[in-house]
């Protein structure tokens, strides 16, 4: 009873922090100058992390097993994983764009957990026989950590694509405007003002330099985080295969969850392969990561909607 009450309190605190965090996050998206608000949002993520840690420990204590037996608990662990990834750049006081991705991921995932959509799964139950194994912690935790890292890395790649294509569209529109107005009186007058041209060129060059630096940093950090996630995912799949052989007598059964996990692994293996070729780095590899981002959500969330296969104990119904 004490553990249940504590979990209830931590859930409400977490929900309050998430609500405040989402509000602050949306405000900082429109008003970049309010630095104090952004810092408050980041501290809110740390508070949410502590609450999630307390939730997981409390749930583990009164259920008697590691809390990764259904979608609700795995989403809790996913939020916790996002927060862990968030801690590294936060305490080093660098890479604010990485922290923006991880903090927003933590806030919105935890918001989904506390939204009430998964209320039927919040009550801890006795594990089904297939899950009563020491492999539960190893397999599921590695898979969820892998998903968290891959999602964060993929979102950095998405940010890279947005910046790159916005730049391409801007250049294209400027070329059209130049062709349209190249013989106008305003253009001729502008050409007669060399000082303005020099100032404008200097500003554009500086802006392009910082944009190029940002794209390069996004590309580098995306590659690092995805590489880490790929390692976690590989360990998770291998440990799951060993567990499946013990539980069902076969290392691989090609049920929907296993199939999409393999597709996810293959997609990010392709991503890492493209990184070995300098001609396919940056934008091309980011496109692969974006496709991987979609596939992860199909594997992690979409397959659970089917409620079929050997992993059907993690399914849920929206009603």
UniProtKB/Swiss-Prot annotation:
Protein's cellular compartments: Plastid, Chloroplast thylakoid membrane
Annotated keywords: Chloroplast, Cytochrome c-type biogenesis, Membrane, Plastid, Thylakoid, Transmembrane, Transmembrane helix
Keyword DNA repair applies: no
Biological process terms in GO annotation: cytochrome complex assembly
GO cellular component terms attached to this protein's record: chloroplast thylakoid membrane; plasma membrane
InterPro entries reported for this sequence: Cyt_c_assembly, Cyt_c_biogenesis_CcsA, Cyt_c_biogenesis_CcsA/CcmC
Keyword Membrane applies: yes
TM stretches of this protein: 9-29, 44-64, 71-91, 143-163, 225-245, 259-273, 286-306
NCBIfam families: cytochr_II_ccsB
Biological function: Required during biogenesis of c-type cytochromes (cytochrome c6 and cytochrome f) at the step of heme attachment.
Oligomeric form and interacting partners: May interact with Ccs1.
Entries under PANTHER family matching the protein: CYTOCHROME B_B6 PROTEIN-RELATED, HEME EXPORTER PROTEIN C
UniProt protein name: Cytochrome c biogenesis protein CcsA
